[in-house]
């Protein structure tokens, strides 16, 4: 079944490091040369908090797969010392020590890594750990990009925290250029009504608050359940049929999942499926708010544009 494993982690969402010790200067004479204190490093996280470091992060822990991908995109993968289960991209991330899962990170195991920066996602899940890190003087940065445009911004901010601006800046600009190209290419195209399949048994979807809907908008797609009151509502088959989507979009783990989805929707009588308009995109790329979502958006735009062809 597609997206069953990805759904909980993808939609559940909806501290400063100590500075240099102050030395006793009372015995200093006028001849003692002054030592310039390095300027603190600042970056605003996705909760609007100012995160401050005394020096670039060199022992960071990520608590979400997308955060790991963002760190690597910022050129700072070498400075990760641990992550969570499921944080598997890029391949180098699979060699990192695992300190639990994203919903219940183990504070003791995290503290044992001697981190100087925690990159978290869900405040509710990270709160107990954040309290421990606060006592230890370890900064916590919350990463939760809500739009495609926020992804390159996140890469740049992480570059600041790690001191890898020389790598992060060009990476962010490349992502922006690709997004700008999509916006220019698909602006004004005929709208395509899309059902976002976040689960099939039972049926779940995503509303406008999801970053997937932002990708749809970029491609000229219209989320047929965009106005749902919650981010990931369960919906009935009758509601999907009544919405009359032109296409179905689902995150998949393997190409065979798309064929199974197509067969399932055909059996349920969805006209879009009868026309073959059921599309699958790698679930991790589609649902993680990281750099690979730009890849997913490019594929999505191309899929929807083929549907527009006579």
Stretches with model-predicted labels:
Residues 2-66, 164-196, 247, 302-310:
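Bacterial Sec-exported substrate-binding components of ABC uptake systems
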Residues 40, 49-50, 116-117, 121, ...:
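Extracytoplasmic substrate-binding proteins
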Residues 58-113, 117-122, 224:
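A short, structured surface patch at a secondary-structure boundary
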């Amino acid at each position: 079944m597609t997206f069953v494993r990805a759904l909980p982690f993808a939609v559940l969402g909806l501290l400063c490091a100590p500075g240099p010790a102050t030395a006793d200067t009372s015995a200093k004479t006028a001849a003692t040369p002054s030592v310039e204190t390095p300027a603190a490093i600042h970056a605003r996280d996705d909760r609007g908090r100012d995160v401050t470091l005394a020096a670039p992060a060199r022992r960071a822990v990520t608590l979400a797969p997308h955060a790991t991908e963002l760190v690597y995109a910022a050129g700072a993968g070498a400075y990760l010392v641990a992550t969570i289960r499921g944080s598997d991209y890029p391949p180098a991330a699979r060699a990192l020590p695992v300190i639990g899962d994203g919903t219940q990170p183990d504070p003791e195991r995290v503290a044992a890594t001697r981190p100087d920066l925690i990159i978290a996602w869900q405040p509710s899940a990270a709160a107990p750990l954040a309290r421990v890190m606060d006592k230890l003087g370890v900064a916590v940065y919350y990463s939760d990009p809500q739009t495609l445009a926020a992804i390159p911004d996140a890469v740049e901010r992480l570059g600041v925290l790690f001191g890898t601006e020389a790598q992060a800046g060009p990476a962010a600009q490349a992502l922006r250029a690709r997004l700008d190209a999509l916006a220019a290419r698909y602006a004004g195209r005929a709208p395509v009504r899309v059902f976002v399949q976040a689960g099939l048994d039972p049926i779940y979807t995503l509303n406008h608050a999801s970053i997937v809907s932002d990708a749809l908008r970029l491609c000229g797609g219209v989320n047929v359940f965009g106005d749902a009151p919650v981010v990931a509502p369960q919906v009935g088959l009758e509601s999907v049929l009544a919405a009359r989507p032109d296409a179905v979009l689902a995150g998949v783990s393997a190409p065979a999942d798309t064929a199974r989805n197509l067969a399932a929707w055909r059996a349920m009588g969805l006209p879009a499926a009868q026309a073959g308009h059921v599309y699958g995109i790698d679930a991790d790329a589609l649902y993680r708010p990281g750099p690979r979502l730009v890849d997913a958006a490019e594929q999505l735009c191309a899929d929807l544009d083929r549907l527009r062809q006579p």
